[in-house]
């Protein structure tokens, strides 16, 4: 089964066109979207997430055709963007409590395990976290609600090589059972 299928998708802007893009991401795989800044990687991910509308083409996420996927399918997506997106006034512990309300399959024990594994202080305000720590928090959150498909948009850019390698190792662990998949956009070819 494919975790993600894009068939002939198009999105036109005044100064940019994503033109007839097709690809699939099978379960048990990591698919890389690579390109320079402005090449359409984030546009593609925003289309997959339903944040912007398609001009034409079809997208299927975990077997469900878009343009908007059901809450059940959305609950099976783990999304990590280049910014974690959690309020800086919160702590990692508070983020976990908030996400427990948002995801029916939230696994607090798994989340706490990732916080410990990554050395993330649960009571420290996120404003005091480094960029690498915030990215680790995003990965911990994405992996703690039984997501089937991880979507990472430039999630490794700006990270030091040790943190980047650690994150990439985690992605390899994530797909080992052939029941999960990853879509990773980057302009860093060594990430792929």
Feature-to-residue mapping (PLM):
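Conserved beta-strand
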Residues: 6-9, 16-26, 33, 57
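Walker A (P-loop) phosphate-binding loop of ABC-type ATPase nucleotide-binding domains
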Residues: 36-40
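Helix-to-loop junction immediately C-terminal to a conserved catalytic motif
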Residues: 49
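Conserved ABC transporter NBD signature motif
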Residues: 57-68, 72-73
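ABC-family P-loop ATPase nucleotide-binding domains
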Residues: 75, 81-138
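Catalytic Walker B motif of ABC-type/P-loop ATPase nucleotide-binding domains
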Residues: 150-154, 159, 184
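Helical segment within the ABC ATPase nucleotide-binding domain
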Residues: 164-179
């Amino acid at each position: 089964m494919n975790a993600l299928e894009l068939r002939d998708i198009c999105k036109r802007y005044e100064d940019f066109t994503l033109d007839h893009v097709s690809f699939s991401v099978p379960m048990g795989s990591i698919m890389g979207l690579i390109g320079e800044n402005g090449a359409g990687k984030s546009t593609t991910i925003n289309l997959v997430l339903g944040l912007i509308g398609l001009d034409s083409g079809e997208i299927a996420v975990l077997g469900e055709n878009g343009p908007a996927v059901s809450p059940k399918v959305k609950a099976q997506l783990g999304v990590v963007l280049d910014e974690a997106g959690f309020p800086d006034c919160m702590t990692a512990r508070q983020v976990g409590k908030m996400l427990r309300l948002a995801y029916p399959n939230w696994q607090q024990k798994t989340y706490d395990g990732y916080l410990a594994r990554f050395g993330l202080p649960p009571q420290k305000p996120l404003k005091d976290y480094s960029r690498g720590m915030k990215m680790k928090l995003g990965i911990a959150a994405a992996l703690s609600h039984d997501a089937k498909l991880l979507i990472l948009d430039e999630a490794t850019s700006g990270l030091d090589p040790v943190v980047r390698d650690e994150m990439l190792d985690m992605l390899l662990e994530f797909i080992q059972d052939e029941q999960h998949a990853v879509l990773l956009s980057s302009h860093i070819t060594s990430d792929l």
